[in-house]
Regions:
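C-terminal, low-ordered peptide segments at domain boundaries
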Residues: 5-97
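C-terminal "post-core" interaction segments
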Residues: 66-72, 76-99, 108-335
Length: 335
């Protein structure tokens, strides 16, 4: 990086410093000797602030042994991109896919509501059934239960998340009606990614491929300085709070995955086995496709699997948040 050799002690300063551009030297990895050799080539990357990535990084329909397999690499649960996510599943349904590989290897979480939509589109046969249960502290649990009792609301929507066939705006969700899903996950898969895996598990067969997930089974809400009951924010306050306020369980009450969710098939992503994302020869996707076709073949990475470096930005960006009706907590705080 900028003419300096990257190592485990300097990578944070080199990659996460104040520089607005980087010159990155390229190298090839030699599996037999477990070493890198410079190619003499380099690329220049310019830093862009406030850039919002489209979380739908790859969406493909693969013909694998005569079977149509959908592949979606999804990097964050962002409700701003729900329309694109819905369109992706509409395309999958139109193509008549019979299996789905969902790649969450870099997905640190996001909106619970978007997670519910995704789970509902993967399935479709569980509309109205519980997908996830929110476990709040005793005071808020009592408040929500009393609120539902007073309004004769029997489905506890303040506490539970249900499979649905429409969005909150009334948009119809496409459904694949799958009974199996193959999910690629790593230790960077956190929060809403883990909620999706855990929430689907009691309902369909979830085959988890990769390594143990991050282990974040809690959720947060955004607390603004509202100046009225109409949702208008104080223009003088540009910050908000994001407290962790709840734990989320699946429909059978399981929420104890603070140490992560273990894979059914373990295969670590490493510099020793990197492939092209979306390629059928990329090791993790290759393994998922082999589970679908039943070939059972295994790609052995060349050389030792290298331990990944810790990303100091990941702790700040992974998370799971829920969207409550505007007055729900405000009314509680008045009591």
């Amino acid at each position: 990086i900028d003419g300096r050799q990257l190592n485990v002690t300097n990578y944070v300063n080199l990659l996460y410093g104040d520089a607005m551009s980087y010159t990155i030297g390229l190298a090839e990895y030699e599996g037999n000797t477990r070493s890198f050799t410079s190619t003499g080539e380099s690329i220049v990357l310019d830093k862009v602030e406030d850039f919002q990535e489209n979380p739908i990084h790859k969406n493909l329909v693969l013909d694998v042994g005569g079977q149509k397999v959908g592949y979606l690499m999804y990097n964050q649960f962002l409700n701003e991109f729900d329309d694109q996510l819905i369109q992706t599943f509409s395309d999958f349904a139109a193509e008549g896919i019979t299996d789905l590989v969902l790649d969450l290897r870099y997905n640190g979480g996001g909106s619970v509501l978007t997670c519910v939509y995704l789970a509902s589109m993967i399935t479709g046969q569980f509309t109205g059934e519980i997908f996830a249960q929110q476990i709040w502290n005793s005071k808020l649990l009592a408040y929500f239960e009393a609120l539902n009792s007073n309004t004769n609301d029997t489905d506890d929507r303040e506490l539970n998340n249900y499979f649905t066939n429409t969005t909150s705006e009334g948009v119809t969700l496409p459904a694949l009606n799958l009974s199996n899903v193959y999910i690629i996950a790593t230790n960077r898969s956190a929060s809403a990614s883990e909620l999706l895996i855990n929430g689907l598990a009691p309902h369909i067969n979830v085959v988890l491929i990769g390594n143990t997930t991050y282990g974040k089974n809690v959720g947060s809400i955004t607390v603004y300085d509202y100046i009225d009951n109409e949702g208008n924010k104080n223009p003088n306050h540009t910050y908000a709070m994001q407290p962790i306020v709840l734990k989320i369980a699946n429909s059978v009450g399981f929420a104890d995955y603070a140490n992560g969710l273990d894979p059914d098939i373990e295969l670590r992503e490493s510099a020793s086995n990197l492939g092209v994302l979306g390629s059928t020869t990329e090791p993790l996707l290759y393994m998922a496709l082999n589970q679908i076709t039943g070939s059972g073949k295994y790609l052995v990475p060349q050389g030792k699997v290298l331990n990944p470096m810790t990303d100091p930005e990941f702790e700040a960006t992974n998370g799971m948040h829920i969207d409550l009706p505007q007055n729900t907590l405000k009314d509680f705080l008045k009591n």
